[in-house]
Design a protein with these regions (language model features):
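Conserved HGGG/HGGXW glycine-rich cap/lid loop of the alpha/beta-hydrolase fold
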Residues: 1-39
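Short aromatic-enriched loop/helix-cap "lid" or pocket-rim segments at secondary-structure transitions
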Residues: 14-15, 39-42, 103-108
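Aromatic pocket-lining residues of Rossmann-like dinucleotide-binding sites
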Residues: 21, 81-85
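Active-site loop/oxyanion-hole signature of alpha/beta-hydrolase fold enzymes
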Residues: 28-69
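Gly/Ala-rich beta-loop-alpha elbow adjacent to hydrolase catalytic centers
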Residues: 70-78
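Flexible "cap/lid" loop of the alpha/beta hydrolase fold
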Residues: 83, 89-121
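Helix-loop "lid/cap" segments that line or gate small-molecule binding pockets
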Residues: 126-146, 168-174
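Conserved serine/cysteine hydrolase catalytic core
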Residues: 161-183
Length: 183
């Protein structure tokens, strides 16, 4: 099971590796509500999205998966799937997941501060702020392929993604608790 990162499209995170993995594994890749061009819905909450993932695994995999890999935000889903114990996974792998948690007030402040800065990058493929866009271009010129690879993983312009989906995802991730010592 592959779970993409914050505000990311599944194809940009995993499109290149799915064909390689399919040679040896049955591959499932999550498409979060609000982040795919084929749907016109919005991301609800981490728990609502987790319930949908669990329901799919229960119905289509008998409640058992061999492994789940979560990139960034996807790691929070791996943690939630393990903690809730509604499905069984043999291995949970976190990739660059910070698992940050915050109070509702702190989460709202972070969301309200960061989203206006990064949402234009998600929607239009570039920052609205000339300062941030120039910093990105300078960093890209200095670090070349690394920055280009990161931006490709993040995805190109996605005008179908709403600000509300981004807010819901970012805020909900911060306020959804994960217990300590998940088995």
């Amino acid at each position: 099971l592959l779970l993409p990162g914050t505000c990311c499209h599944w194809k940009s995170n995993f499109g290149q590796v799915i064909p390689l993995l399919q040679r040896d594994f049955r591959v499932l890749c999550v498409n979060y509500d609000g982040f795919d061009e084929t749907e016109s819905n919005e991301f609800p909450t981490m728990l609502a999205e987790t319930e949908k993932i669990e329901a799919y695994i229960l119905k289509n995999c008998g409640g058992h998966i061999r492994a789940a890999y979560g990139c960034s935000l996807g790691g929070s889903f791996v943690g939630l799937l393990a903690a809730r114990q509604n499905i069984h996974m043999d291995y949970g792998i976190l990739g660059s997941s910070d698992l940050d948690q915050a109070s509702p007030l702190a989460a709202r402040l972070q969301t309200d501060f960061l989203l206006p800065l990064i949402y234009p990058l998600i929607r239009d493929g570039q920052f609205k702020s000339r300062f941030l866009q120039k910093r990105l271009e300078k960093c890209s010129a200095e670090k070349g392929d690394y920055v280009r690879a990161f931006m490709a993983m993040f995805g190109a312009a996605r005008p179908y993604v709403t600000m509300q989906s981004c807010k819901n995802q970012f805020y909900s991730d911060l306020i959804t608790p994960l217990p300590e010592g998940i088995d």
